Curated annotation (Swiss-Prot):
Entry keyword Nucleotide-binding: yes
Positions that bind ATP: K11, F59, R87, T93, R104, N114
Protein name per UniProt: Nucleoside diphosphate kinase
Database matches in SUPFAM superfamilies: Nucleoside diphosphate kinase, NDK
Required co-factors: Mg(2+)
UniProt GO BP: CTP biosynthetic process; GTP biosynthetic process; UTP biosynthetic process
Keyword Magnesium: yes
Molecular functions per Gene Ontology: ATP binding; metal ion binding; nucleoside diphosphate kinase activity
Gene name of this polypeptide: ndk
Source species of the chain: Rhodopseudomonas palustris (strain BisB5)
Localization, UniProt: Cytoplasm
Amino acid sequence: MAIQRTFSILKPDATERNITGAINALIEKAGLRIVAQKRIHMTRGQAETFYAVHKERPFFGELVDFMISGPVVVQVLEGENAIAKYRDVMGATDPSKAADGTIRKAHAKSIGENSVHGSDAPETAAIEIAQFFAGNEIVG
Ligand code: ADP
Ligand code: MG
């Protein structure tokens, strides 16, 4: 399996509770390397662009409001099969359905405030990384 990169966000519920280090520990324990990372406060425009795929969903407004409610940590993760591996480490979107040992099982507050984002495919990973990082900010 090839080395891949995926895009990750530690969401406002994680920065608010000061658990970004605890989440990073789970990421690293899974064998993923944090090859880029910065703390930002997303603008409404950035959040709307990022989640444009969900703009017709009933929770879109709530999701954008949440993502701009506080700072986030955006990251690029690198490793073998990184996209699927990180989805496994994150756990199910709804923390009540997330498996033991996953980030969302351990830390998520609700289906909306669920601590982390991870890309779902190589195409979306490339688009999401490029939205937030220049090439020279990623150091593998
Ligand atoms: P995932 O983040 O697991 O890929 P989705 O892409 O389906 O999940 O949804 C994007 C984000 O929208 C979720 O992580 C969550 O923050 C939010 N969300 C999804 N479903 C709901 C819902 N039913 N109610 C509120 N927020 C939701
Ligand atoms: Mg998704």
